[in-house]
Design a protein with these regions (language model features):
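Non-catalytic signal-transmission and effector/linker regions of two-component phosphorelay proteins
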Residues: 1-16, 26, 59, 121-135
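Two-component/phosphorelay signaling modules centered on CheY-like receiver
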Residues: 22-41
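Acidic catalytic/metal-coordinating carboxylates
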Residues: 45, 73-76
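Alpha4 helix (beta4-alpha4-beta5 surface) of REC/receiver domains from two-component response regulators
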Residues: 76, 97-114, 123, 127
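Hydrophobic/aromatic residues positioned on beta-strands within the core alpha/beta folds
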Residues: 93-95
Length: 135
């Protein structure tokens, strides 16, 4: 007889968290894993995260990425991730004020699904991620 729990586990959302600040990437991962999400992978290096995503792109439901990072910013990361998997949901995080016109200029085609403004509470992060996953 098939194990029903095993089938359910296969459909749990897999989340990629990317922030060059190790403590923040780890904190977001812990927040998500504490309540809802079991499959959360955190990265501090955009190039390493992109390589991992390239290999495992079919498994991911959502990417949460900081915008301002060295070597590759969040907008560049999103463009590359969308080339690999156009259906993955994208949340960007920033501590800076960014208006809709700037988003449209910098990221005209590959839209994002939401924005997390830092600092954000655990509750805010969970609410935003849960809402985007359900869409």
């Amino acid at each position: 007889m098939p194990n029903k729990n095993r089938n359910i586990r296969q459909y749990e959302p897999k989340v990629l968290v990317l922030d060059d600040d190790f403590d923040l990437a780890t904190l977001v991962k812990q927040i998500l894993q504490k309540d809802v999400f079991k499959n959360v992978f955190a990265f501090t290096d955009p190039l390493l995260a992109l390589e991992h995503f390239r290999i495992n792109h079919k498994d991911y439901s959502i990417i949460i990425s900081d915008i301002r990072m060295p070597t590759m910013n969040g907008f560049e990361f999103v463009r590359e991730a969308r080339k690999i998997n156009p259906k993955v949901k994208i949340l960007l995080m920033t501590a800076f004020e960014i208006d809709d016109k700037e988003f449209a200029r910098v990221l005209p085609k590959p839209k994002i699904d939401g924005l997390i403004r830092k600092p954000a509470s655990s509750k805010e992060i969970l609410n935003i991620v849960s809402t985007v996953i359900k869409r």
